[in-house]
Amino acid sequence: MSRIGKKPVQVPAGITASVDGQKVTAKGPKGELFFVANDEIGLKLEDNAIVVTPLSNSKDARSKWGMSRTMIENILKGVKEGYERKLEINGVGYRAALQGKNLQLALGFSHDVVYEPPEGITIAVPKPTEIVVSGINKQQVGQVAAEIREYRGPEPYKGKGVKYAGERIVRKEGKKK
């Protein structure tokens, strides 16, 4: 029995949610998102809450039960509050700047890296060493942050590179003379 899946997802005030077969649509102040559940998952909207149930007792249905509930909860939070991921840049000469909507990164290569964000993602650069990725889709925000970090991930000797805010880098000791 899924402990996460058992709890109904409460629809917050200010959000309209609708269930149409396997599709849950949520509209809120930040935008509109939808989630299509697996055929083995049943969805019902009752008392301003979405109830998720497995239609069979198979292992596959039970494993997708909790995940479906969490995905619905994520789209409801996304259209109400949105998601953001902060990145930090460490290193001499490493910096970020916005060029229109595109992100321009100086990361020690012979050329600047230009990253074009996908539709629905907003990138802000409050300081040259800070990047804030925000949007309503949690998966997409995390994916964009991971792609930016991938250009120059933090290295273990000096900690130079792009890292998530609050990420702890395991440092290594250099060579002994």
From Swiss-Prot:
One of its GO terms (cellular component) is cytosolic large ribosomal subunit. InterPro entries: Ribosomal_uL6-like, Ribosomal_uL6-like_a/b-dom_sf, Ribosomal_uL6_a/b-dom, Ribosomal_uL6_bac-type, Ribosomal_uL6_CS. GO terms for molecular function: rRNA binding; structural constituent of ribosome. One of its GO terms (biological process) is cytoplasmic translation. Pfam families: Ribosomal_L6 (PF00347). The keyword rRNA-binding applies. Keywords: Ribonucleoprotein, Ribosomal protein, RNA-binding, rRNA-binding. Gene3D superfamilies: Ribosomal protein L6, alpha-beta domain (3.90.930.12). Part of the 50S ribosomal subunit. HAMAP family: Ribosomal_uL6_B (MF_01365_B). Belongs to the universal ribosomal protein uL6 family. This protein binds to the 23S rRNA, and is important in its secondary structure. It is located near the subunit interface in the base of the L7/L12 stalk, and near the tRNA binding site of the peptidyltransferase center. This is Large ribosomal subunit protein uL6. It comes from Rhizobium rhizogenes (strain K84 / ATCC BAA-868) (Agrobacterium radiobacter).
